[in-house]
């Protein structure tokens, strides 16, 4: 238990093809009093352009304060490594910071969809074409990639690659699940395909789940429940924390 309404589970298993896989899952009870789901940004700042990057640990340090304690975070959207442009829209606390998608044919798994928390505290995962008609009812938003579970149906088979993954999903009973899958490390964790991620999310009871930025960006942070420090739970494939452009974080109303 990371905090009331926030639980972490680590799963390490060997698949039928003998490849090892290590998964970290955060279960968030969205309807638990004092638990909030938010978009994290570098320096906890509402930025509309000239985007910057920070590690999750640095983002957590800036966002954390009494009665707004960061309990867990995962990395979120993709970005252009040369221009720092974020691929999808960004909303924070109802403020629209960016309301467009940057899709490139050379990067067909990015800028396809978005994740949102509505102003009445409901989760949404939807295709990018649906964003315009919904944007003014959305409180927290980031862009996302391939939808791996669509209304209970596993999807994403078009892209068979095995990689480190970051995934966010939700169930119809008010639970949100952060999941990261380590990869590219032989005998520890190879990673997963989109179809495998969708299967795991469905087994967890999710109805919708979507891929976020993966590879070396795949990272999960928690506030250690005993030591009261921020800790990266997985093993980033870069060998260290990679600074990222935004994150999904869960905060709790604790002193």
What are these regions (language model features)?
Residues 75-160:
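Active-site-adjacent helix-turn-beta-strand microarchitecture at beta-sheet edges
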Residues 21, 31-34, 120-122, 170-177:
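Beta-strand-turn-beta hairpins that frame and shape the catalytic cleft
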Residues 1-107, 113:
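Zymogen propeptides
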Residues 71-75, 114-116, 123-126, 167-169, ...:
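Structural recognition of the beta-strand scaffold that forms the well-ordered cores
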Residues 47-51, 134-139, 187-193:
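A short, polar/proline- and glycine-enriched secondary-structure boundary/capping micro-motif
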Residues 83-107, 154-208, 217-255:
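Conserved, well-ordered active-site substructure
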Residues 40-48, 129-134, 181-185:
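Short, solvent-exposed aromatic-acidic interface loops
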Residues 12-14, 21-25, 143-173:
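Conserved beta-alpha junction segments in alpha/beta enzyme cores
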């Amino acid at each position: 238990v990371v905090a009331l309404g926030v639980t972490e589970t680590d799963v390490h298993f060997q698949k039928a093809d003998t490849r090892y896989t290590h998964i970290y899952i955060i279960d968030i009870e969205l309807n638990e009093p004092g638990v909030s789901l938010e978009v994290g940004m570098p320096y906890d700042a509402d930025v509309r352009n000239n985007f910057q990057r920070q590690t999750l640990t640095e983002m957590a340090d800036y966002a954390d304060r009494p009665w707004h304690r960061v309990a867990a975070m995962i990395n979120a959207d993709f970005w252009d490594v040369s221009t720092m442009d974020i691929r999808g829209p960004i909303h924070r606390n109802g403020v629209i910071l960016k309301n467009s998608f940057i899709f490139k044919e050379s990067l067909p798994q990015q800028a396809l969809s978005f994740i949102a928390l509505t102003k009445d505290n409901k989760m949404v995962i939807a295709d990018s074409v649906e964003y315009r008609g919904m944007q003014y009812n959305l409180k927290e938003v980031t862009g996302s990639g391939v939808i791996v579970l669509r209304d209970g149906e596993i999807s994403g088979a078009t892209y068979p690659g095995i990689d480190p993954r970051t995934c966010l999903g939700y169930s119809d009973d008010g639970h949100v699940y952060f999941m990261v899958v380590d990869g590219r490390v032989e005998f520890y964790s190879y990673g997963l395909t989109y179809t495998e991620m969708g299967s795991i999310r469905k087994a967890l009871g999710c109805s919708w789940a979507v891929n976020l930025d993966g590879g070396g960006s795949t990272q999960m942070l928690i506030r250690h429940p005993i030591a009261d420090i921020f800790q990266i739970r997985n093993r980033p494939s870069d060998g260290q924390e990679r600074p990222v452009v935004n994150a999904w974080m869960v905060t709790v109303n604790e002193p």
